[in-house]
């Protein structure tokens, strides 16, 4: 492929992906899910001069417990820092739209990197020029239109950005590894430094960057050939017995340690900040995340996750929990949203996973999937693997299109076709995924409109009821949405008994509780019983603008407000 053709192909893929993501972003008018609001809200606070601050205290597992509080006790800051750049230019009036600029650009770049990965795989498989070109461009086109990649290219969180960094790191790993076996005496330090920069920036985006680093370590230590061109008897004997000569060991150490040092150096300032702010250089509640027994444990206040509570479930419950986490990551993240490409890609992955061009991505994908499924089986059901799975979906696209290309070539030989029809594979894939993409974007657009309508109507309704927002922090089941829409301090509602919530309210001086009736949480239904402290929650009826009761069409019909009043 000529340089001109490569630039034209990359430009065409980027343009297609950009248009699709811009349309999707325009359809989403409010940050959903809540973590999206967190990233965009912190970016707004940075632009307004408040620094890395959040008005929502959504987790009680990291000290100090204050509200507003320093942001990113669990997540990483880079998505917010980048979102602050267009926000600083455009202003904070349209803070969410400004934040979407970064996600649209990052999501479009994912498609270009997918094209490059497909082209590398095609070159390694030694496909004819026409089929190779089709596989590369087809991979980029499918990545431009695949529902999950489109959706998270419209939402300013960590997903699209981490996918860009993961794919870039894996592409660079394959190039460094290929040079190790090409006869060159040493890999230039600039490539190793660049890899370290990518790993460090990825670590500032998501904690799953560690699995990228381990994938590179595995490639360096076990996957690289001994230095090409060394045909001495000593080298041949060492190669037969799996022994690394001293010079080889030194080179492998350099390949591993230079990127690791650069990545650690880039992460060091953030680690120091966390140490000074939260008392730990790394996310302090990671261990507790592994001990969750319920999706609501992230909001636990008095009943914190513990090893004793985790083991007390018994073997059957633990097996069921891990099966649920595995099933969520497999079905809800990889197969169903990307159907049928996700399913086909998984089935044919053994056909391509030995390709050196895909090896780093395969290793990182397997490590990420295994750790999130086995160690964080409950936390992953809230998005741990999902937000790190962008690059994994690209891997499945390449595997699926490579299999379709082989199938079409085989059918062509059997049917004696004379015209090239490799384009049928990407065409079939696009025809299959576009309807689901439209449905996915439409669904999240409706959700965003519903959530925005609810939080736009809530302040006026509470003012009419005589309990205006702003008098101290508010306890609520969606603390980030309320904090960012009403610009007030909020506290996450623990899924615990009323007396525990009373302790929380007394500690922070909260006088109001706002909760949605969703049939999933025990709140507010728990107040209908005789639980200790239930009588301290006095419901405040909400009315419409005319003073009448809320009808079924009101965005607040499922919203309940309580005044916390206890002697």
Describe the function of each predicted region:
Residues 34, 98-106, 138-173, 201-213, ...:
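Multi-pass, polyprenyl lipid-linked donor-dependent membrane glycosyltransferases
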Residues 11, 133-137, 197, 213, ...:
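Signature aromatic-anchored transmembrane alpha helix within multi-pass, membrane-resident enzymes
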Residues 18, 139-144, 191-206, 213-218, ...:
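Membrane-interface alpha helices of multi-pass inner-membrane proteins
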Residues 98-128, 168:
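Transmembrane-helix motifs of polytopic, lipid-linked glycan transferases
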Residues 420-481, 489, 494, 498, ...:
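Membrane-embedded, lumen/periplasm-facing catalytic core of multi-pass transferases
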Residues 11-18, 137, 143, 199, ...:
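Transmembrane alpha-helix segments characteristic
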Residues 70-85, 89-112, 137, 152, ...:
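Loop-to-helix entry region of an early transmembrane alpha helix in multi-pass inner-membrane enzymes
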Residues 221, 320-369, 403-406:
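Hydrophobic, aromatic-rich transmembrane alpha-helices
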């Amino acid at each position: 492929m000529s340089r001109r053709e490569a630039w034209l192909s990359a430009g065409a893929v980027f343009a297609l992906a950009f248009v699709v993501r811009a349309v999707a972003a325009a359809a989403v008018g409010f940050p959903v899910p809540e973590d999206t609001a967190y990233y965009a809200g912190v970016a707004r606070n940075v632009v307004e001069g408040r620094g890395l601050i959040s008005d929502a205290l959504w987790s009680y597992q990291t000290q100090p417990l204050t509200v507003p509080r320093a942001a990113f006790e669990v997540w990483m800051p880079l998505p917010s820092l980048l979102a602050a750049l267009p926000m600083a230019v455009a202003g904070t009036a349209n803070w969410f739209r400004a934040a979407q600029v970064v996600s649209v650009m990052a999501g479009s770049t994912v498609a270009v990197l997918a094209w490059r990965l497909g082209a590398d795989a095609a070159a390694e498989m030694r496909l004819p020029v026409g089929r190779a070109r089709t596989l590369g461009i087809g991979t980029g086109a499918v990545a431009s239109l695949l529902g999950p990649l489109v959706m998270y290219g419209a939402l300013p969180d960590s997903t699209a950005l981490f996918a860009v960094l993961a794919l870039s790191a894996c592409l660079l790993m394959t190039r460094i590894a290929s040079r190790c076996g090409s006869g060159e005496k040493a890999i230039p330090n600039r490539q190793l430094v660049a890899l370290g920069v990518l790993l460090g920036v990825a670590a500032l985006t998501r904690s799953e960057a560690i699995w990228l680093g381990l994938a590179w370590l595995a490639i360096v230590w076990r996957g690289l050939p001994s230095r090409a061109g060394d045909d001495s008897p000593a080298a041949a004997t060492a190669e037969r017995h799996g022994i690394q000569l001293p010079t080889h060991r030194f080179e492998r150490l350099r390949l591993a340690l230079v990127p690791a040092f650069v990545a650690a150096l880039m992460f060091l300032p953030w680690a120091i900040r966390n140490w000074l702010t939260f008392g730990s250089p790394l996310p302090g509640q990671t261990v507790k995340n592994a001990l969750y027994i319920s999706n609501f444990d992230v909001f636990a206040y008095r009943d914190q996750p513990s090893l004793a509570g985790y083991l007390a479930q018994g073997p059957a419950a633990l097996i069921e929990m891990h099966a649920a986490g595995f099933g969520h990551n497999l079905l809800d993240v990889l197969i169903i949203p990307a159907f049928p490409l996700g399913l086909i890609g998984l089935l044919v992955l053994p056909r391509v996973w030995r390709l050196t061009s895909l090896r780093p991505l395969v290793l990182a994908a397997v490590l990420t999937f295994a750790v999130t499924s086995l160690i964080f089986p409950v936390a992953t059901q809230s998005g741990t693997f999902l937000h790190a799975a962008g690059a994994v979906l690209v891997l499945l696209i390449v595997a699926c299109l490579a299999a379709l290309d082989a199938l079409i070539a085989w059918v062509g030989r059997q049917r004696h076709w004379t015209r090239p029809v490799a384009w049928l594979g990407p065409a079939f894939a696009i025809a299959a995924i576009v309807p689901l993409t439209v449905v996915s974007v439409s669904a999240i657009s409706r959700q965003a409109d519903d959530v925005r309508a609810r939080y736009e109507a809530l302040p006026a309704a509470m003012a009419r009821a005589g309990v205006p927002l702003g008098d101290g922090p508010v306890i609520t089941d969606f603390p980030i949405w309320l904090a960012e829409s009403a610009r007030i301090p909020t506290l996450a509602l623990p899924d615990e008994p009323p007396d525990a919530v009373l302790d929380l309210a007394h500690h922070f001086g909260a006088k109001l509780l706002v909760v949605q009736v969703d049939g999933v949480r025990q709140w507010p239904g728990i107040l209908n019983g005789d639980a200790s402290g239930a009588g301290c929650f006095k419901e405040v009826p909400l009315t419409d603008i005319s003073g009448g009761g809320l009808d079924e069409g009101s965005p607040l019909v499922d919203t309940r407000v309580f005044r916390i009043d206890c002697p």
